[in-house]
Amino acid sequence: MNHSLKPWNTFGIDHNAQHIVCAEDEQQLLNAWQHATAEGQPVLILGEGSNVLFLEDYRGTVIINRIKGIEIHDEPDAWYLHVGAGENWHRLVKYTLQEGMPGLENLALIPGCIGSSPIQNIGAYGVELQRVCAYVDCVELATGKQVRLTAKECRFGYRDSIFKHEYQDRFAIVAVGLRLPKEWQPVLTYGDLTRLDPSTVTPQQVFDAVCHMRTTKLPDPKVNGNAGSFFKNPVVSAETANALLAQFPTAPHYPQVDGSVKLAAGWLIDQCQLKGTQIGGAAVHRQQALVLINEHDAKSEDVVQLAHHVRQKVGEKFNVWLEPEVRFIGASGEVSAVETIS
């Protein structure tokens, strides 16, 4: 076990894997998976490692998905993009804007690559991937059979999809299809975006505002390792939300279509005065309470203990129990993040 995973996870946690393989096409990915499986090893497929926390050394092969390529089909009503799973997400957002194909600007600066975007149904500032996803192309690892799932078949939810359930270990995402309508409609429901005028705003202005909000609030993983938002924004019943709002009338809350209410995890953590709290080398970020950072050579145990502490404090004060958005990886694969920090 001497292949360091530190360069392959944005948290910068130093654990090792038995083997690390970069796959630049589907065949290389299948070969690496089949070789490791024949040896009886667990296999983990990673993009840019921007949403994982390695808890210990990984007893198997980590495959880095670097399948590239962008194809564009110009239709009368929309642009259709077919994008390789290994393409960087933010670079794609910039590229589509430069080419005059707006629609992804709210999702600027989300770390990671295209292949990870459907797994989490990534989202920010009022837009989720499902809004623009046309399909996801996968390969069944055991057989090499190609499968195309429509957006509906992906069963997208809040930071959720079929790729976290039935398709988790049996399939690898090789490409994502996006549909960007030519009739652009700005989404200006969050943060500084609410100050923009919907009748005159341009996609570039939305992009600039999102980049400004993210760079001023969020730490750069190159300076302080992190995995972006550590916790999901909790979705609670209207009853729970009303009880909380009776006590804390200023709490940010976002009613959902199904009658539930989404709360702001960052606000809940902030109300517990946890910004700057440190355990070992891990800390709650001082500008954005939703982000846990590797401040100084943090061990994975430091991050787990800090996450547990934050969850307990918020639970005791608000009776709302936060769940990590980050995926926890043990020696032979993903483990329950909630159980790990409970």
From Swiss-Prot:
Pathway as given in its UniProt record: Cell wall biogenesis; peptidoglycan biosynthesis
Catalyses which reaction(s): UDP-N-acetyl-alpha-D-muramate + NADP(+) = UDP-N-acetyl-3-O-(1-carboxyvinyl)-alpha-D-glucosamine + NADPH + H(+)
Catalytic site positions: 159, 229, 325
PROSITE patterns, per database record: FAD_PCMH
EC number(s) reported in the record: 1.3.1.98
Gene3D superfamilies hit by this protein: 3.30.465.10, UDP-N-acetylenolpyruvoylglucosamine reductase, C-terminal domain, Uridine Diphospho-n-acetylenolpyruvylglucosamine Reductase, domain 2
Protein location: Cytoplasm
Top-rank taxon: Bacteria
Keyword Translocase: no
GO BP annotation list: cell division; cell wall organization; peptidoglycan biosynthetic process; regulation of cell shape
Broad class of enzyme this protein falls into: oxidoreductase
Family, as annotated: Belongs to the MurB family.
Name used for this protein in its record: UDP-N-acetylenolpyruvoylglucosamine reductase
Gene name linked to the record: murB
